[in-house]
């Protein structure tokens, strides 16, 4: 009974969300609703009720914690005038999921202000730096192992970002077991890029990304950069004119070799990284990354949405609420049985 009550409360909360969005659409004469993640559906329903356009922007691969949305593809298809996915591997994946419609691409955008100059308090010593939260998915332990294999006298390995406690402990244990020196964790910083020196090499060994915004920030700041070849990183690497170097995820020999080569030729690497910034800034402009979206915003036709008035009438009914609760209860019982 407690679970049933929780489900009813959740469904009622969703209904309130949809109603609130509908009121916003009406009060503000909204012509287009954009859902900026696959993980929400309320905007899609509100747009259908009010007969306005709805775009779905999908940043997530249909796997892992987001694998559930493979079962929701029909809903996404029905309630979207246009579907957009992060350029590269995700777009290719979703084209297979939606074979009967065009999936448009975009690049995730974040406001980046490249530094006019970088700190120079490096006493002419190179550092290997990695920006981002310390997590299993970010896979920083791979970089720590590579650093151990390199055994570079005087070179520091610096991590800039907060951390998940369990994963930080895993890294600390490895550092202690191997008696590694010159590894530091600076924690969260409002502006980690301000800590970068003109002698630093950035390395991002993440095991999974949708696009790789931290890589984008790195090359836009003119930093020599190495990144792993997970699907999201490859998409960003291709989008940013293949600036930097990419290595096979999990291949420690390849990573150590690449770090060594970049450090050996660092002056030329730095020069090329800085020279690439103007063209990369132009490529990664707001107008460029969202070009497909703005083009479709200007299109007055509702091209793909398949929802009918009959669907809307049903969703407005108490029967729909009952069906939603029954579906949720069924899933709970299935999970209980599995456990």
Model-derived features: where do they sit?
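Donor nucleotide-sugar binding/catalytic pocket of nucleotide-sugar-dependent glycosyltransferases
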Residues: 78-115
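A conserved mid-protein helix/loop that constitutes part of the nucleotide-sugar donor-binding site
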Residues: 126, 133-149
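Glycosyltransferase donor-sugar binding loop
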Residues: 131, 156-169, 185
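Aromatic "clamp/platform" in nucleotide-sugar-dependent glycosyltransferases that forms part
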Residues: 188, 207
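Short glycine/serine-rich donor-binding loops of glycosyltransferases
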Residues: 212-215, 233
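Short hydrophobic beta-strand element within catalytic cores of glycosyltransferases
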Residues: 224-228
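Conserved acidic donor-binding segment of nucleotide-sugar-dependent glycosyltransferases
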Residues: 241-253, 260-267
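A charged, aromatic-enriched C-terminal amphipathic alpha-helix characteristic of glycosyltransferases
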Residues: 267-323
């Amino acid at each position: 009974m407690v679970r049933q009550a929780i489900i009813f409360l959740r469904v009622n909360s969703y209904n309130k969300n949809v109603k609130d969005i509908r009121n916003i659409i009406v009060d503000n004469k909204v012509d287009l609703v954009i859902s900026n993640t696959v993980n929400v559906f309320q905007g899609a329903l509100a747009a259908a009720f009010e007969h306005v356009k709805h775009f779905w922007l999908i940043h997530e691969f249909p796997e892992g914690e987001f694998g559930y949305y493979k079962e929701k593809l029909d809903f996404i298809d029905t309630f979207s005038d246009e579907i957009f996915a992060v350029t590269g591997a995700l777009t290719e994946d979703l084209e297979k999921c939606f074979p009967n419609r065009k999936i448009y691409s975009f690049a995730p955008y974040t406001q980046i202000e490249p530094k006019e100059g970088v700190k120079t308090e490096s006493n002419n010593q190179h550092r290997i730096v990695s920006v981002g939260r310390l997590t299993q998915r970010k896979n920083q332990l791979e970089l720590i192992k590579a650093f151990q294999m390199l055994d570079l006298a005087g070179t520091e390995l610096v991590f800039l970002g907060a951390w998940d406690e369990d994963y930080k402990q895993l890294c600390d244990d490895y550092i202690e077991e191997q008696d590694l020196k010159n590894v530091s964790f600076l924690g969260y910083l409002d502006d980690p890029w301000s800590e970068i020196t003109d002698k630093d090499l950035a390395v991002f060994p993440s095991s999974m990304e949708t696009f790789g915004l931290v890589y984008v920030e790195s090359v836009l700041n003119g930093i020599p950069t190495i990144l792993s070849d997970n699907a999201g990183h490859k998409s960003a690497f291709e989008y940013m004119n293949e600036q930097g170097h990419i290595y096979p995820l999990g291949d420690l020999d390849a990573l150590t070799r690449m770090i060594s080569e970049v450090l050996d030729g660092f002056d030329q690497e730095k020069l090329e990284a800085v020279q690439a910034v103007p063209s990369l800034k132009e490529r990664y402009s707001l107008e460029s990354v969202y070009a497909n979206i703005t083009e479709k915003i200007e299109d007055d036709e509702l091209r793909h949405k398949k929802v009918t008035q009959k669907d809307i009438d049903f969703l407005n009914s108490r029967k729909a609420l009952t069906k939603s609760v029954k579906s949720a209860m069924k899933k709970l019982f299935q999970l209980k049985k599995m456990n």
